[in-house]
């Protein structure tokens, strides 16, 4: 999948605006997430202390809430960060990692849905569970297909007024009325930890860009799919794929 004009327009905004993206993400993926954002032209920051998180969320252009390694103190810090972002009119994005499979994070994510996320990005099982249509998958792994979760994504978008991206072999991005389909990528993306979480950070950054938010989130998904398609041709396994993936993001304009 080559980036189209819309994707390149969004990429131009990434590169020229360098959105400061506050990533309250899980401990496993922080470095990879930061490198993905940097390769696209965004500016990552990982601030987790509750008092600082609230302050920084108000300064940043966008906030990501990823519950992959959620703890009670971190949940408190995330709430405060969301409050800071909302008070400053900054968009925040939810990545409901393993929601439906684990009870504490499921309750937490259901509670913060009322705080008006700009976007929600999850796999099929997570989106189904968050929409109240399924018990969830096997931890961070999905047991459903993205297409099977599309009705749940549409319902969740209508309920929350957020852009919902349900991702997998094919990605679907919806605002509850319009839906975009993004193809491409490679199965190797599932063999490197953090590609989904990093996508959520790119989605968060995209929510701060001017223009149609649905299109910007779809463009974010397209960037990652395109990089995966390129990286698999330049790599010999998961280790080299991760490096090639970052390089492919960096070189997106040259590939268009």
Curated annotation (Swiss-Prot):
GO molecular function: ATP binding; hydroxyethylthiazole kinase activity; magnesium ion binding
Keyword Glycosyltransferase: no
Enzymatic reactions: 5-(2-hydroxyethyl)-4-methylthiazole + ATP = 4-methyl-5-(2-phosphooxyethyl)-thiazole + ADP + H(+)
CDD domains: THZ_kinase
Residues that, per the record, bind ATP: 121, 167
Enzyme class of the recorded protein, top EC level: transferase
Pathway annotation: Cofactor biosynthesis; thiamine diphosphate biosynthesis; 4-methyl-5-(2-phosphoethyl)-thiazole from 5-(2-hydroxyethyl)-4-methylthiazole: step 1/1
Residues the entry annotates as binding substrate: 46, 194
Cofactors, names only: Mg(2+)
InterPro entries xrefs: Hyethyz_kinase (IPR000417), Ribokinase-like (IPR029056)
Record bears the keyword Transmembrane helix: no
GO biological process, one term: thiamine biosynthetic process
Task performed by this protein: Catalyzes the phosphorylation of the hydroxyl group of 4-methyl-5-beta-hydroxyethylthiazole (THZ).
This protein's name: Hydroxyethylthiazole kinase
Organism: Enterobacter sp. (strain 638)
Taxonomic lineage of the native organism: Bacteria, Pseudomonadati, Pseudomonadota, Gammaproteobacteria, Enterobacterales
């Amino acid at each position: 999948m080559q980036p189209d004009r819309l994707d390149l327009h969004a990429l131009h905004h990434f590169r020229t605006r360098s959105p400061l993206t506050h990533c309250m993400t899980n401990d496993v993926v922080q470095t990879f997430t930061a490198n993905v954002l940097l390769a696209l032209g965004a500016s990552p920051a990982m601030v987790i202390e509750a008092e600082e998180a609230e302050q920084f969320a108000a300064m940043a252009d966008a906030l990501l809430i990823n519950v992959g390694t959620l703890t009670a103190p971190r949940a408190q810090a995330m709430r405060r960060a969301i409050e800071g972002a909302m008070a400053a009119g900054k968009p925040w994005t939810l990545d409901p990692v393993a929601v439906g499979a684990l009870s504490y994070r499921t309750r937490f994510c259901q509670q913060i849905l009322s705080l008006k996320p700009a976007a929600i990005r999850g796999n099929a099982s997570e989106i189904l569970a968050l929409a109240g249509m399924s018990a969830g998958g096997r931890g961070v792994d999905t047991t459903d297909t993205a297409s099977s979760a599309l009705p749940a994504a549409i319902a969740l978008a209508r309920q929350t007024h957020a852009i919902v991206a349900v991702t997998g072999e094919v990605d679907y991005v919806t605002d509850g009325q319009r839906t975009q389909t993004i193809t491409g990528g490679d199965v190797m993306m599932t063999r490197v930890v953090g590609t989904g979480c990093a996508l959520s950070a790119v989605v968060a950054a995209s929510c701060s860009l001017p223009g149609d938010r649905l299109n910007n989130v779809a463009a974010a998904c397209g960037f990652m799919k395109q990089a995966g398609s390129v990286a698999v041709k330049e790599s010999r396994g998961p280790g080299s794929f991760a490096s090639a993936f970052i390089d492919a993001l960096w070189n997106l304009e040259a590939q268009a």
